[in-house]
Amino acid sequence: NKPAGKLPAQATSSKVSIDQSGNIARSIKSGTNVNSLLQSINEKQYCEIRKNNVKQSGNVSVGTGMQLCVINNNKVVKSYNIIVTGDTNGDGKTNITDLIAVKQSILGRSSLSNIQKQAADMNNDGKVNITDFIKVKAKILGRE
């Protein structure tokens, strides 16, 4: 049911922050499912959410590392890496696993990928530090 007319080359939204040059979709809350994310995209009828290049649907949780893809004639014309705030492990939730990952990164015991760092950067200051650790902890405890 794709409407006739000009096919979009990119995704836009007033609810999700979409970085066209960096190919990133962020400001997505943990616990968001595929249906609700697609509803927040203006070009939803042309978009898919994929994980490891497999289309996701319905109530599947959207996680960091999935892709928002704009589709034209069954081909991906633009793809955005999804960043779910607080979700470093890609399960779509912010939980103790994410808190431990942030702690280990701060202590230098493990490193996060660029996308994981962006998910862990809760205050969007470009760094992963104790402030982010406290914010992840507060989110888990329901104090955010």
Which residue ranges define each predicted feature?
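Cellulosome-associated attachment modules in secreted, modular CAZymes
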Residues: 3-6, 14-31, 35-144
